[in-house]
């Protein structure tokens, strides 16, 4: 009896220590660092892609890339899931006009903590570029229709 309790307690400790390490993503989404991601092949404008992401899952937005590890994960996800991407794939970064001052922030409202620009230009919406293995950010016209990645 004592051995059963000891083994049961040990299994409970292992379960509890592992239960917080991955996001609780549905089967069609991929998990990385506690967040869920899904790449979509259909082409949408930046605004339509952002709207689509918010309707997919509670807390969903276009992807916010906050580290080089996350950039590598997203690039790999795009390469796996969106083989038809011609030039670029939308991410959640966009220039916002706030009280006549332009600020760049992620569509989920978070500030930029990691940067990976190809070059800064005057266009307002950003995507990851195919020529860089979908790792570098580049400005594109917001009305272009392209694939995208959602994050929750």
UniProtKB/Swiss-Prot annotation:
C-type lectin domain span: 24-152
Annotated signal sequence range: 1-23
Keyword list, A-Z: Blood coagulation cascade inhibiting toxin, Calcium, Disulfide bond, Hemostasis impairing toxin, Metal-binding, Platelet aggregation inhibiting toxin, Secreted, Signal, Toxin
Places the protein is found: Secreted
GO terms for cellular component: extracellular region
Amino-acid positions noted as binding Ca(2+) in the UniProt annotation, renumbered to this chain: 64, 66, 70, 151
Alphabetized Pfam families for the sequence: Lectin_C (PF00059)
Tissue: Expressed by the venom gland.
Disulfide bonds: 25-36, 53-150, 125-142
GO molecular function annotations of the record: metal ion binding; toxin activity
PANTHER family given in the database record: MANNOSE, PHOSPHOLIPASE, LECTIN RECEPTOR RELATED
Similarity annotation: Belongs to the snaclec family.
Protein function: Anticoagulant protein which binds to the gamma-carboxyglutamic acid-domain regions of factors IX and factor X in the presence of calcium with a 1 to 1 stoichiometry. Also inhibits platelet aggregation by binding to platelet glycoprotein Ibalpha (GP1BA) and functioning as a blocker of vWF. Is devoid of hemorrhagic and lethal activities. Possesses antithrombotic and thrombolytic activities. Also hydrolyzes the Aalpha-chain of fibrinogen. Does not affect the Bbeta-chain and the gamma chain.
UniProt subunit comment: Heterodimer of subunits A and B; disulfide-linked.
Name of the protein: Snaclec anticoagulant protein subunit A
Top-level taxonomy: Eukaryota, Metazoa, Chordata, Craniata, Vertebrata
């Amino acid at each position: 009896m004592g051995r059963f309790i000891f083994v049961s307690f040990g299994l409970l400790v292992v379960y509890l220590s592992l239960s917080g390490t991955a996001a609780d993503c549905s089967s069609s989404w991929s998990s990385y660092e506690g967040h869920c991601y899904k790449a979509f092949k259909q082409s949408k404008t930046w605004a339509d892609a952002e709207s689509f992401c918010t309707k997919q899952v509670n807390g969903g937005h276009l992807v916010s890339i906050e580290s080089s590890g996350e950039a590598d994960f997203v690039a790999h996800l795009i390469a796996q899931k969106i083989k038809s991407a011609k030039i670029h794939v939308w991410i959640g970064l966009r220039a916002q006009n706030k009280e006549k001052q332009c600020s760049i922030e992620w569509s989920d409202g978070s500030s930029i903590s990691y940067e990976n620009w190809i070059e800064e230009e005057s266009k307002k919406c950003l995507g990851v570029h195919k020529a860089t293995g979908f790792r570098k950010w580049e400005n594109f016209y917001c009305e272009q229709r392209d694939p995208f990645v959602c994050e929750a």
